[in-house]
Amino acid sequence: MHTFSHDARNLTLDAKAGGCFCERLPDGGGVEHMRVVYASPGKLLRLSGAIGPLQEAALAGTMTWNLSQAGGGTTVELIYTVGGFRAGGFRDIPTVVDGVLRGQLTRLKALVETGRPDGGSR
């Protein structure tokens, strides 16, 4: 889990327009990772913000979660687009961010299918 507090239980998402994807920190502080800009329950969730270390640069990001019904289940499509200025450029960023997001999607799939984010038995 990639969080500043190293504990996913500190993450919250208020999935409505203007809602916060936020994290409580152990010292009483907090982090606003992203802000919800579009919410259509069961269909689409769009957030705006630069996640993780991208917050330190002059970047803007948009993350879109598209949900669609398929074969008795749900297909999840995640798109995260980032632009702006970053000292040193972007060469190393896409691979790292894609890897983190892919890992989170893998954990989400395991949670839905097994009830545990690590995919283990209950």
Region annotations inferred by a language model:
Residues L13, G28-G30, Q55-L59, A70-G72:
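A generic structural micro-feature
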Residues A50-L54, I79-R86:
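Short, solvent-exposed aromatic-acidic interface loops
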Residues R46-A60:
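Short solvent-exposed strand/turn elements
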Residues S40-L45, G72:
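Short, conserved beta-turn/loop elements at beta-strand boundaries and strand-helix junctions
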Residues E32-Y38, G61-Q69:
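Hydrophobic/aromatic beta-strand elements that line small-molecule binding cavities or substrate pockets
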Residues H33-R35, E56-A60, R86-R91:
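A short, polar/proline- and glycine-enriched secondary-structure boundary/capping micro-motif
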Residues T75, V82-R122:
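A conserved amphipathic terminal alpha-helix motif
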Residues M1-H33, G42-L44:
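Short beta-edge strand/loop motif at the mouth of beta-sheet-based domains
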